[in-house]
């Protein structure tokens, strides 16, 4: 069903790498990042895959409310690079994180 837009919740957790590969391959597949900031290093690693594969535009902001909140999720995303201080690990692109937070998801999915 290539005309149907499909969103894979939680970036496909625990199969984030596979999910990144699948959303890269199929133009009608997207993923959200809901509830993932509870495991910050795992989220960092998953978003680094997103960055390396060039699929930031396929990610949607999500919170998994009521278990998490909008503000908690945004704060968690914005703090991800902070845990890398003192390391040589590559940083996530802060502009891409902000773009994901503010993305017009409904129009992207053809729902507006």
Model-based region annotation:
Residues 1-61:
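Catalytic pocket-lining loop regions of alpha/beta-barrel enzymes
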Residues 55-60, 71-112:
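Mid-to-C-terminal alpha-helical segments outside catalytic/metal-binding sites
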